[in-house]
């Protein structure tokens, strides 16, 4: 047998073995989106007032995708762009939802687009009978390391000290302990100058708790102006934080983060309250931040997160996504499980039950694990949910989509 013939035969056999487990492209079911619904979970109490709305996208093929995020009005408008469309054209649908109206999507609408995008990827995985991380090329890590905010660990009480919380977090298997530099009761006085003195003592206690080989994180939560952020970062440098989170205000991040970078030596992380690829592009390229806080569904879903991850991988910047909800976290495990750079996720659901999600996250010993369940790997108990929205008709009012000659979507 000639070498060329042999190689061709081997390649064909390998392809046959691989494709034997999957439907051929031509055999993929033709389907259309027929209905989008949104629900509130039982006793909704979203962390930090973020949306825990559950979103479903139904198709005429009997496959339903599950997502999380958004609010009634922003979901209604974006969902209306999906009715009658093929859910397998995810990038095209994302571009349409993002570009079809006069104003570019702001943060609230981007969150809704992200929730719907998660459901579209869930459908894609279910069509192929594969977890989304396999659809995206396969996981590159065995698990995702996690950090725990405030040491919310079974057995730790409300009167536990910072040192006790930090120690318990590391002993539970988490990579890092996280606490807020600005944690005070709402509607009370906040003096940034005085808070920095308190901050130094708390950071010293956190370091003592995690030990010399453990990690800890402090969140400034944007409550410090630039001068106090500089002072705060320099005051705690000796205690070696894994990173300082959101040290300056969102409104000025493009100006203040580059300035802060030149004034301090601690690693910086930012972006939980803002962040599409254009927001992060220059900051990542110039290494003004060491870790990107981009998260789901806030950035616009998995479709947009993959592009942000590509920026981070190009410039060797890590990703430490903010926690928004359990379904979104399942999507993060699938999405960032395929990212080859450093990843650490926020997880605060240890010991908590989720009645509407009998199957969701695979968490053990401070780590989140990928699984082999199709799609995002989550299942809903519909009896636990309260419907707040149903969309069955396309939204065309004031929507205008334009196309290049090749059929790709261009600007409004």
Where do the model's predicted regions map?
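Conserved, mostly hydrophobic/aromatic
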Residues: 62, 116, 129, 219, ...
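Extended hydrophobic packing segments that form well-structured cores
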Residues: 376, 380-412
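Metal-dependent enolase-superfamily TIM-barrel catalytic cores that perform enediolate-based chemistry
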Residues: 143, 151-258
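N-terminal secretory signal peptides
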Residues: 1-2
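N-terminal export signals
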Residues: 5-26
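Metal- or metallocofactor-binding catalytic centers and their adjacent structured scaffolds
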Residues: 36, 58-130
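C-terminal segment of N-terminal export signals and the immediately downstream linker at the start
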Residues: 20-48, 57
